[in-house]
């Protein structure tokens, strides 16, 4: 796999508070290799390791995106909900930024039925005004609840190839479903997390909003660049030759 430069600078990570962990009393022993120091009673994440792991993960998602792999981003913290939705739309990823519905992946047959119903209701929106008020109100209420819980995955036709988990403790149900189905996971791991539960751990503060956005934006950039390469390589050869000769 080719190594690329993702402009991951230590000073930017410090500014985003990526390095700040939890109280040392909350440390997960398996996080010891990723911790470089402690400030008063707070563990400090080794940012050189964060930079290396993040860079390697960006290389991997670039390659995956260039091969057409599908991503699901899971981040339900209220403070990052809008950032998750915007980032996912930018990179053409599925996302969950509200409450995770238990069994969303492990009970995929039921989820598919819900998604089919959701898409059907979206198509029916135009005729809601022609329905009796009571019927229209029921459908609007159903549509509202489905949009809230499944809005970010409404066009997901099959299980994702890779899932990005932004908070191991907060999204543990989603992570457990991925483990059960052997879906590869990328995860921010704070000093109180278990790095062994995810396939690609990125040591980082998962409580600081700037930290989450910093990591997410790097991954999204890599996915977007991978998608762009896929678009270019999939063009007919005569078009690529014309562009090259310009």
Swiss-Prot record:
Keywords: Chloroplast, Plastid, Ribonucleoprotein, Ribosomal protein
Molecular function in Gene Ontology: structural constituent of ribosome
Cellular component GO terms held in the UniProt record: chloroplast; mitochondrial small ribosomal subunit
UniProt GO BP: translation
Pfam families in the record: Ribosomal_S2
Compartments, as annotated in UniProt: Plastid, Chloroplast
InterPro entries assigned: Ribosomal_uS2 (IPR001865), Ribosomal_uS2_bac/mit/plastid (IPR005706), Ribosomal_uS2_CS (IPR018130), Ribosomal_uS2_flav_dom_sf (IPR023591)
Primary localization: plastid
Matches recorded under HAMAP family: Ribosomal_uS2_B (MF_00291_B)
Protein family: Belongs to the universal ribosomal protein uS2 family.
Protein name as catalogued: Small ribosomal subunit protein uS2c
Organism: Pelargonium hortorum (Common geranium)
């Amino acid at each position: 796999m080719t190594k690329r430069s993702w402009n991951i600078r230590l000073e930017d990570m410090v500014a985003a508070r990526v390095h700040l962990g939890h109280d040392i009393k909350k440390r997960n022993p398996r996080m010891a290799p990723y911790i470089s120091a402690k400030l008063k009673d707070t563990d400090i994440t080794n940012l050189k390791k964060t930079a290396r792991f993040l860079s390697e993960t960006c290389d991997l998602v670039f390659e995956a995106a260039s091969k057409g792999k599908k991503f699901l981003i899971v981040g339900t913290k209220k403070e990052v909900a809008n950032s998750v939705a915007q980032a996912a739309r930018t990179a053409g990823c599925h996302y969950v930024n509200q409450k995770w519905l238990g069994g969303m992946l492990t009970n995929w047959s039921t989820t598919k039925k819900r998604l089919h119903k959701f898409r059907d209701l979206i198509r029916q929106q135009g005729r809601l005004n022609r329905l009796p008020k009571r019927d229209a109100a029921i459908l609007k209420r159903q549509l509202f609840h489905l949009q809230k819980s499944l809005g970010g995955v409404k066009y997901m036709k099959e299980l994702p190839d890779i899932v990005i988990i932004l908070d191991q403790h907060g999204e543990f149900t989603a992570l457990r479903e991925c483990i059960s189905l052997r879906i590869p996971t990328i995860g921010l791991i704070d000093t109180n997390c278990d790095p062994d539960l995810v396939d690609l751990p990125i040591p980082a503060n998962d409580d600081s909003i700037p930290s989450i956005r910093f990591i997410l934006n790097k991954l999204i950039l890599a996915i977007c660049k991978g998608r762009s390469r896929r678009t270019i390589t999939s063009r007919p050869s005569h078009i690529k030759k014309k562009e090259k000769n310009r």
